């Protein structure tokens, strides 16, 4: 089914996003229940359910942020590309938003704002979180006095002030 295919494709993103240790992946000879339980824990089907708790994020992603695609190459012979194409609008958006078009004006506004200004701000990212790639980590390379970008080594989507390395945590607290 399309949802199952999407879950298989989502798995690799989820694994990196949440910093899941490879050692937690069940062995190939594990029983079916162990494998299915692990798979559902990593990327449950509720992510692709109608009226999802993060539905508003999906609307904003389609309209303002953009959204990641999937690497289907390893699964090419198993996945129907037509089922996957346009899945975000077809599967994750309420029908009334099906015709929403991407508008990069908010993205450009934010980028211009950070380029032209130096607000007192702390940005925290995890090194292995795929979302870090779309962050404004490029601010580290600018001569900004007030904008500080911290990338937690080995960190995931769970990167927080409390779990930063001590030296970074001290810099963050000093900035606050």
Regions found by a protein language model. Give the residues of each.
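Alpha/beta-hydrolase fold active-site neighborhood
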Residues: 1-105
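The feature captures the conserved acid-bearing segment of alpha/beta-hydrolase catalytic domains
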Residues: 105-116
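Solvent-exposed loop/turn segments at secondary-structure junctions
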Residues: 128-130, 156
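Short, solvent-exposed amphipathic alpha-helical segments in soluble enzyme
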Residues: 138-142
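Catalytic active-site module of serine/aspartate enzymes centered on a nucleophile-bearing elbow/loop
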Residues: 151-176
């Amino acid at each position: 089914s399309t949802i199952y295919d999407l879950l298989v494709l989502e798995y690799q993103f989820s694994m990196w996003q949440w910093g899941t240790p490879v050692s937690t992946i069940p062995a190939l000879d594990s029983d079916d229940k162990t494998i299915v339980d692990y798979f559902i824990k990593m990327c449950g089907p509720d992510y692709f359910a109608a009226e999802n708790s993060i539905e508003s994020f999906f609307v904003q992603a389609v309209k303002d942020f953009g959204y990641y695609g999937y690497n289907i190459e390893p699964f090419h012979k198993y996945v129907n590309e037509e089922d996957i194409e346009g899945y975000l609008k077809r599967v994750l958006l309420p029908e009334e938003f099906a015709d929403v078009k991407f508008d990069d004006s908010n993205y450009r506004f934010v980028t211009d704002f950070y380029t032209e200004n130096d607000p007192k701000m702390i940005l925290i990212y995890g090194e292995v979180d795929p979302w870090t790639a779309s962050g404004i980590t490029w601010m580290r390379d600018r001569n900004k006095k007030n904008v500080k970008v911290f990338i937690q080594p080995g960190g995931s989507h769970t990167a927080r002030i409390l779990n930063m390395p001590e030296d970074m945590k001290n810099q963050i607290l000093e900035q606050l």
